[in-house]
UniProtKB/Swiss-Prot annotation:
Pathway involvement of the protein, from the record: Porphyrin-containing compound metabolism; protoheme biosynthesis; protoheme from protoporphyrin-IX: step 1/1
Subcellular locations according to the entry: Cytoplasm
Record-level GO BP terms: heme biosynthetic process
Annotated EC: 4.98.1.1
GO cellular component: cytoplasm
Record-linked InterPro entries: Ferrochelatase, Ferrochelatase_AS, Ferrochelatase_C, Ferrochelatase_N
Protein name as annotated: Ferrochelatase
Reaction(s) catalysed (UniProt annotation): heme b + 2 H(+) = protoporphyrin IX + Fe(2+)
Family: Belongs to the ferrochelatase family.
Amino acid sequence: MSFRTEPPYIHGSTPKTAVVLVNLGTPDAPTTSAVRRYLKQFLSDPRVVEIPRAIWWFILHLVILPFRSGQSAKKYASIWSNEGSPLKVHTEKQAKLLNGYLGERGHKVKVVYAMRYGQPALPDVLRQLKADGCERILFLPAYPQYSGTTTASIFDAVFSHYTQERNVPELRFIKHYHDHDAYIRALRKSVQAHWDMAGRPDKLVMSFHGVPKRTLTLGDPYHCECHKTARLLAKELELTQEQYMVTFQSRFGKAEWLQPYTAPTLQKLAKEGIGRVDVICPGFTSDCLETLEEIAMEARHDFMSAGGKDFNYIGCLNEDDAWIKAMAEITELHLIGWPTIVPPSLREEQEQQAHISREEARRLGADQ
């Protein structure tokens, strides 16, 4: 086992705390080559595709990447903004706003963001945090509902990174927040704001990203957490069971995934005479390809072409103030016990003690 070279140890330094907001990732550009690189990394993760590696290698490299990369690039191009990928833009802004809000609340922490796939790569961000002297790191996945296909993959990447480090920092992980009051309230405010302007629909469809059905039978709690989020949001909105429903989108491959599927369900609703539907994607905290293209464009077409009259997509929480405050509340809960809020008098004392420690180390022969 070989380890990476560590930065020089600095005696008397004050340990720093960091929060890493981690999202799924995105291609660097809406081009076939960039999308191919991204898909290769994403679909090579055994957490994402549970097929024997040898078999999957041939499927991925001989079928999926040659044909799907170009198709996906066109879809990315349809939602790409002047700032870049919407998912990356929103995640970066969320991290900056969370950093500022925690600072206003007195926390001395550094908030950064990383992507599980693509850039900024999680290992690169972790190396920079080490160089910055961060010895306590809290990981905040951008996924409210836990899944082995998403959240656990972040944990895997973090653990893998630190197997090659000698000096490992204190690590904490937020597993999920699907039923956190602040998250549910932020969703309610988002929906209610839309309804205050446009009125209520005949049906509110809550569309979550799908996963293979077998993951449910094998013990993944994702399905249950999605339904709990939906139930709590419906309660906040005072909806009856007939006024909302849960669906699952983004099916990939031929295997059975969690049902009902979003697109066929919308078509069915239109044919049954449901004139207006509003669709929200509570599992996505930043708008991205799956919301802006798959739902706002494709799902709209499916519903309207089947006879629907009015389709509204309610955007993700993105930089909504209620969501930033919710993120802060969730983060603060998991920062308990770490000295991120230090009174000025105590901070001065800590600096004095650090100076004494540093001078004593130098007296004994330390370089730094």
